[in-house]
Amino acid sequence: MFDILMYLFENYVHSEVELLVDEDELTKELTRAGFHQSEILKALTWLERLAELQEGDKPYLCNHDQHSFRIYTKDEMDKLDVESRGFLLFLEQVKVLNVETREMVIDRVMELDEPTLILEDLKWVILMVLFNAPGHESAYEQMEDLIFEQPEGRLHS
């Protein structure tokens, strides 16, 4: 499923091509690209649920204390290793993510059918969430810079 999400993001969203095709047309294209029907349906459902999160009707997205600290469940810790959780905390500290977008990211990560998610894949999920979150264009651009900018020169001598 994650491969399909990446395919859609790279071919439609990130390339700035309008995603105005209907679901049947998109399913046919993804099938021609070699993806299986069941995985296509999972990916499209994942995207639909991401769009639903923007409506703000989830209780965990409505009320929060700015000084609260996120405690991860066992399932979340199994899927997101220490490095990934640290990266989410870093993004909050530098204001790329806020409480709501962090929870959207975690929600979408937990819906992926991968048992664990490596940091590079987490970065793409974050980018997808920020792209779909109205009013977070600046955060999206910052995240895009974090993904695509390569450090110049040597880090260590």
Swiss-Prot record:
One matching Pfam family: DUF494
Which PANTHER family does the protein's record reference? PROTEIN SMG
- Can you say what this protein is called? Protein Smg homolog
NCBIfam families from the UniProt entry:
PRK03430.1
| Family to which the UniProt record says this protein belongs | Belongs to the Smg family.
Domain of life (superkingdom): Bacteria
**Organismal lineage:** Bacteria, Pseudomonadati, Pseudomonadota, Gammaproteobacteria, Alteromonadales
**Species this protein is from:** Shewanella baltica (strain OS155 / ATCC BAA-1091)
